[in-house]
Amino acid sequence: MGGQLSIEARLKSIIPQLTFDSHKGACGKVAIIGGSVEYTGAPYFSGISALRVGCDLAHIFCHQDAAIAIKSYSPELIVHPFFKEDYDTNEVLKWLDTVQALVVGPGLGRDESVMEATLSILKQAITKNIIIILDADGLFLINNHLDLIRGKKNIILTPNVMEYRRLCDVLKVSHNTPCNKVALMLGGVTILQKGQVDEVSNGSYTVHVKHVGSPRRCGGQGDVLSGSLATFVAWSKLNQDFQDEDLICCSVAASALVKECSSFAFTEKHRGVIASDIIESIPSVFDQVFGQNKIQLIYE
């Protein structure tokens, strides 16, 4: 890890204590832009993971053809059928003033009109006091508009292997370019590069997450990560002592949590592990990793 960053100490400050006098919203609110007629599971996985980690409210802004399916998956999620012929971006922007974190991309699809609307929202969301996580089709979208995020300290990119390669292609660098160099090329945005060993960097700080995870790679794990990360960064924004480096700490925390959940689910379901099994393990695994007595993270 480059520089000195006390991840455990920051997380102790960031993770809110549960008290009987707290109110709804005190533990954070997040929003997800995603969901299309083909992909209804991804935004659900992201939103429900955010709730399982511990945020209070999760909004999903999706294509109207995906809304009923997502609503039927869980009554816990607040689903807005936004992408339609007469859409108004202000419908989303007014809600973004009430949340601390925004995930863009899960199941979004690549319909041209949806991409155009999402880009319009993203341009304005970046100026708000929220953290924005770009994943999946959100990364595909931003590859053509990297100047929009360059130098922005409220941005986290969460590319998998193929998404990282596409990002490197756009930047005209080798696929083997280290994460910290790519982060610097983008002006210090935070990157959580997913892999067997997740790497987190903003160019100044670099952390390798050493939790083992699972050999089972089922669909939806990236969505579980994006939702989990959204809750951690929402908590960080609610903290009066917020620091830009908290995005590194939150990314490490989310990575460690999802890898441990994946490992736990694998011991129970083996080859049959699906994303829902990983999500189901979040509450108990969270207490093991982030218990009140000691935060147990493995990284370097």
Curated annotation (Swiss-Prot):
Instruction: From the UniProt record, list the reaction(s) this protein catalyses.
Output: (6S)-NADHX + ATP = ADP + phosphate + NADH + H(+); (6S)-NADPHX + ATP = ADP + phosphate + NADPH + H(+)
GO BP, one annotated term: nicotinamide nucleotide metabolic process
What CDD domains does the annotation carry?
Answer: YXKO-related
InterPro entries, A to Z? Carbohydrate_kinase_pred_CS, CARKD, Ribokinase-like
Report residues binding ATP: 194-198, 213-222
Note whether GTP-binding occurs among the keywords.
no
The segment(s) forming the YjeF C-terminal domain are 7-289
User: What domain of life does the native source organism fall in?
Assistant: Eukaryota
MF (Gene Ontology): ATP binding; ATP-dependent NAD(P)H-hydrate dehydratase activity
Q: Where are the transmembrane segments?
A: none
Could you tell me the EC number(s) of this protein?
4.2.1.93
Q: Which UniProt keywords apply?
A: ATP-binding, Lyase, NAD, NADP, Nucleotide-binding, Phosphoprotein
The Swiss-Prot or TrEMBL record lists the needed cofactor(s) as: Mg(2+)
Where is the secretion signal located? none
Residues binding (6S)-NADPHX are G107, N160, V161, M162, E163, Y164, R165, R166, D223
**Function, as annotated:** Catalyzes the dehydration of the S-form of NAD(P)HX at the expense of ATP, which is converted to ADP. Together with NAD(P)HX epimerase, which catalyzes the epimerization of the S- and R-forms, the enzyme allows the repair of both epimers of NAD(P)HX, a damaged form of NAD(P)H that is a result of enzymatic or heat-dependent hydration.
Q: Identify its protein family.
A: Belongs to the NnrD/CARKD family.
Q: Return the protein name.
A: ATP-dependent (S)-NAD(P)H-hydrate dehydratase
Which species does this protein come from? Entamoeba histolytica (strain ATCC 30459 / HM-1:IMSS / ABRM)
